[in-house]
Structures are given as C-alpha cells and as structure tokens.
C-alpha cells in the first residue's frame, strides 16, 4: 500500500493502518510504502520503502511492481508536485493492478486537479470512494467509467463503551459535547463555540470539549494561529470555564475514554465537499447522537434521522441541535437505535473483506483462491 502511515498523524495515515490490519485479518500479506510528506519520524517494521518525493519515484515503482497488486491512498496534499501530480508519474509506470482509494472528490476541481483524477482513473483497475455522492461526482464531473468505481464505506473500530472516566478533563458535572480530530481552518470549531455562547445562561448549557492537535501541515504553514484565534474567541465570549481545548493526538484508550464521557458529538465542518469523515463513522459506531453540518458524508449517513443536520457556519442551528438532543432523552435514544442498525457493516473486518473482493475481481480470482501479496 502506498500511503501516509503512522507515526504520521493524519486521517489518511490512520485509515491506512486500520485497513492494513483488516486486510491482514482477512488473509492478505501487505507491505507498506510510506509517503513521508515531510515527516522525519521513524517508520514501523512493516514499512519497506520510505517515499520522500519525486526523487524516489523510480524506487517506489520498482518495489510496487514486485507485488501482486497495489493499493494507493489518494489525497491531493500527500503527494509531491503541483496538486500532488507525482501520483500520475507513479501510476504510469506501475505494471500490476492498482486499486486507488479517493479520499476527496471535488465538485469544482481546477483543470489540473481534474486532469490528475482522470489520469488516476485511467491507470487504476478500480477506484474506491466511500460514499454514493463521491461516486456520483466522479461519474458526472470526470472521465470515469462508472463500472470501475466501488463504494466502500469508511471503516470503524469498536469503541469501548465502558471506558473509565477520562483523566484529560475535570470531573464531569453537566452534559458534555465533543468534537475531536486534527484541528485547522475549515473544521468550523468557531461556529460551535458561537453556538455555546448562544446556549450560555439557558437551562441547557453543556460543556464543550475540542480534542486534537493542529494538523501537522497546517502547523507547518500557519503555526498555531487558528488555535490561538479559537482561544481568543472563547475568552471574548466568557467561556474559559466551559470550553476545553485538548492539544493532544489521542491514542485509542484516551479517545475511548473521552467518547464514552460525551453526551453528543458535534461536527461543525465548513466544507460542502467532504465525502469522507472518519470521526463521523467513529461517533456512529459509539452510538453517540450527532449534530453535523450538511456535508455529503453526513447527509448520506444521517439521512434516517440518526443525527441532526444543520447548515454550514450556522451557530444558531448547532445550538438548537444541541438543545434538542440534550433536552429530549427520547430523541437521543431513537438516534442511538438507528445507529445500532448500521454499525456491523462498518466494522473494519467487514470493510477489509470488501477490499479483498475488489482485489480478487480485478485479478479474476475468487476470494478463497490465494493469499494476496499486496503493496499497500
């Protein structure tokens, strides 16, 4: 598999690690070709090649070609070159079948971005997107054969519902609203803070927890300007005792403890393009009521009222969503019941099996034929 990979701290790295474990659980042999993306941290043993940029393309391609099949995780920002166009140079020279997982599908790409996706599609045996809306965009806006596109949901691990109380926060004395993940512009945290300001003084006034480090690429370019602006707004609104910013990349145990302590999850993202959210799927798996802005992945997952959708940049809508869930135990329990009907199909073990089925279909084999030797 060619992807960013832990200890790199980003969503795609975490996704790649989870998918790798799931594929291995289902019988595949995997090697990791790690996109370093400016990260100098030491790679785990499973990484057999570190790719720092275009200078490494020949070495990476040579290694990938020694496998039965390659899986490539794609996001414009993780490859070298203009809009990450080095991925095209890699794909042009891969001789084994390729499955490319598209983590972003833009409705209005630049000419260069559209060309890159079209080239990815041309050189891949299969494309994976995680939502039906992603597939629809690919078919409508790009030169992509619909039969080549597979919709496989973002996987999630089981969340420990009985985790001990978190040590990252003071003792809980009122309802807790949670947002987690890497932080940066576009996450919409400022709108959730404004929603908390609207709730202050009302009968329903929870505490709000924002957990996660600043995204490494954001920190590289902008430092902590976004986080500092959030702190300024929190202080201006007089919410210093009501909003907690946890500047930490959480391990699974810490995250489980935090999720278990929450009464609901808020995803206030600005983007109207986001077709994938690992946090959304994890919240769903944990059975936590969700208030989310109206981005594509949320629309698809929460269509059956297993959460509340609000407009982007709408503090009033977020506040009303929080008020509705905390104020109605019946409504919250109904959301949890709807979520529970979806979760088994989202477990990583099930998702890994779906990827193996795609792998065998493009190689013309049945799933039980052999153990795949996959470059991931």
Describe these PLM feature segments:
Residues 10, 330-360:
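A charged, aromatic-enriched C-terminal amphipathic alpha-helix characteristic of glycosyltransferases
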């Amino acid at each position: 598999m060619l992807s960013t990979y832990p200890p790199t701290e980003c969503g795609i790295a975490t996704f790649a690690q989870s998918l790798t474990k799931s594929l291995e659980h289902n019988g595949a042999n995997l090697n990791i070709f790690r996109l370093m993306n400016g990260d100098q941290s030491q790679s785990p043993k499973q990484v057999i090649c570190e790719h720092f940029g275009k200078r490494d393309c020949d070495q990476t391609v040579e290694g990938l070609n020694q496998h039965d099949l390659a899986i490539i995780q794609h996001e414009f920002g993780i490859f070298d070159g203009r809009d990450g166009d080095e991925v095209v140079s890699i794909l042009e020279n891969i001789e084994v079948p390729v499955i490319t997982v598209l983590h972003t599908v833009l409705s209005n790409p630049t000419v260069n971005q559209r060309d890159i996706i079209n080239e990815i599609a041309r050189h891949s045996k299969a494309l994976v997107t995680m939502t039906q809306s992603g597939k629809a965009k690919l078919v409508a806006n790009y030169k992509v054969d619909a039969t080549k596109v597979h919709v496989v949901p973002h996987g999630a691990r089981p969340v420990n519902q009985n985790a001990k109380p978190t040590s990252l926060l003071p003792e809980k004395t009122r309802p807790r609203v949670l947002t987690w993940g890497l932080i940066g512009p576009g996450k919409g945290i400022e709108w959730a803070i404004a929603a908390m300001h609207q709730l202050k003084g009302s009968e329903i006034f929870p505490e709000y927890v924002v957990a996660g480090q600043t995204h490494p690429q954001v920190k590289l370019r902008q430092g902590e300007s976004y986080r500092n602006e959030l702190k300024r707004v929190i202080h201006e609104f007089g919410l210093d005792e009501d909003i907690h910013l946890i500047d930490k990349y959480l391990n699974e145990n810490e995250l489980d403890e935090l999720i278990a302590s929450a009464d609901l999850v808020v995803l206030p993202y600005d983007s109207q393009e986001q077709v994938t959210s690992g946090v959304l799927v994890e919240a769903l798996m944990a059975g936590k009521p969700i208030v989310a802005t109206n981005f594509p992945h949320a629309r698809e997952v929460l269509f059956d009222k297993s959460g509340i959708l609000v407009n982007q940049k709408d503090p009033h809508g977020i506040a009303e969503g929080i008020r509705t869930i905390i104020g109605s135990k019946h409504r919250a329990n109904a959301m949890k019941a709807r979520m529970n009907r979806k979760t088994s199909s989202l477990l990583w073990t099930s998702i890994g099996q779906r990827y193996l089925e795609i792998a065998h279909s493009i190689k013309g084999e049945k799933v039980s034929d052999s153990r795949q030797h996959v470059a991931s």
